[in-house]
Amino acid sequence: MNIWDIIVAIILGIVEGLTEYAPVSSTGHMIIVDDVWLKSKELLTPEAANTFKVVIQLGSILAVAFVFKDRILNLLGMKKNITEEQKSGNRLSIAQIAVGLVPAAVLGFLFEDYIDQYLFSVRTVAVGLIAGAVLMLAADWINRRKDTTDSVDRMTYKQALGMGLFQCLALWPGFSRSGSTISGGVILGLSHRAAADFTFIMAIPIMMGASLLSLIKNWAYLSADLLPFFIAGFISAFIVALFVVRFFLRLINKIKLVPFAIYRIVLGLLLFILFL
């Protein structure tokens, strides 16, 4: 392990932190990086590389949990009335989050082996990037024609279920969990900020659970000589994700989804040109 390896870990953590919660697909970007960098440089064994991805994803998840710490405490009954909506009697509930989680959890369980075997390639990521961009452009167009629910505390169970169904699209690498779910929320009548809030809150339990299970499963690959590599990636992913989530939430109602859609289309077309 040398200083260059640590720099690589930091760069990969930055990629994860930048893309995990922006609607551009962190999985897609990590597959691309894995294909054109990790595999070609042979920095890690395949098993250690997969464990590293889990570690940096955990860093980005903990960052969003930190951003929403007051909301999490509120959901657990440990903090009261953190928004004006809650003071008037409206409140996002754990039940709504559970309703949103069920569809993707069921489909992911049923088709996990198929997804792992057939959908994790640069070509499928390119398809997901472009298809997700089309969905995002459609969501912004629909959003211009209707009034929106501007607070996550006012969303309905129907909207929560609908966003959960849209989240199923993210099982295809490249679609993006946040891109699919925020687009779905906007189509269903939420403001961009309210849809983003629910998307991030809903992601915390399922991604935290999946990451911890994967980490336990791959614990043997956390060897002492790789520990500096893993720690560097974890810290960089946490710090970058912290800034990205806060920045994204401040701006999403103003910039909408179009800039992200344009980026996805350009990247998807570039991947088709380079890898087809």
Swiss-Prot record:
Main location: membrane
Pfam family, one: BacA
Single GO cellular component term: plasma membrane
Subcellular compartments: Cell membrane
Note: Bacitracin is thought to be involved in the inhibition of peptidoglycan synthesis by sequestering undecaprenyl diphosphate, thereby reducing the pool of lipid carrier available.
Family affiliation: Belongs to the UppP family.
Name the UniProt record assigns to this protein: Undecaprenyl-diphosphatase 2
Record organism: Bacillus licheniformis (strain ATCC 14580 / DSM 13 / JCM 2505 / CCUG 7422 / NBRC 12200 / NCIMB 9375 / NCTC 10341 / NRRL NRS-1264 / Gibson 46)
